[in-house]
């Protein structure tokens, strides 16, 4: 089973390494059949966000550039963030999609536990923090 973790980024260099490390180091004890991809949509970062992401050299990290913000200068920040997440989700190939902010840090068991709840319940959508 493939899961996609979608992350929208914009000038997140200050925090992104800690978050990416916490995602790539997820432990799967209940769901041993899981493969993971980290789908990143960057909205034109001008700091080192992309350089940091590229430095991993990890095939699980897929980076996409979101350029819609250039067409929609009138949109507020929350709308632009939503569009950036949508771009990541369009690229996702997983059976399940998890959303990640660029400045979060996840517990090592987060995805495993949430995936177990989703599989047991049979629900397609569930908000789990």
Residue ranges: model-predicted function:
Residues 1-129:
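Nucleotide-sugar donor-binding/catalytic module of glycosyltransferases
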């Amino acid at each position: 089973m493939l899961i996609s973790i979608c992350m929208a980024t914009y000038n997140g260099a200050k925090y992104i390494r800690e978050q990416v490390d916490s995602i790539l180091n997820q432990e799967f004890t209940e769901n041993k059949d899981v493969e993971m991809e980290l789908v990143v949509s960057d909205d034109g970062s001008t700091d080192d966000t992309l350089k940091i992401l590229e430095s991993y050299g990890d095939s699980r990290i897929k980076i996409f550039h979101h350029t819609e913000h250039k067409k929609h200068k009138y949109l507020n920040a929350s709308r632009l963030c939503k569009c950036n997440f949508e771009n990541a989700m369009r690229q996702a190939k997983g059976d399940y999609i998890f959303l990640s902010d660029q400045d979060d840090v996840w517990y090592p068991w987060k995805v495993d536990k949430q995936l177990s709840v989703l599989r047991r319940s049979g629900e397609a959508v569930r908000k789990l923090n």
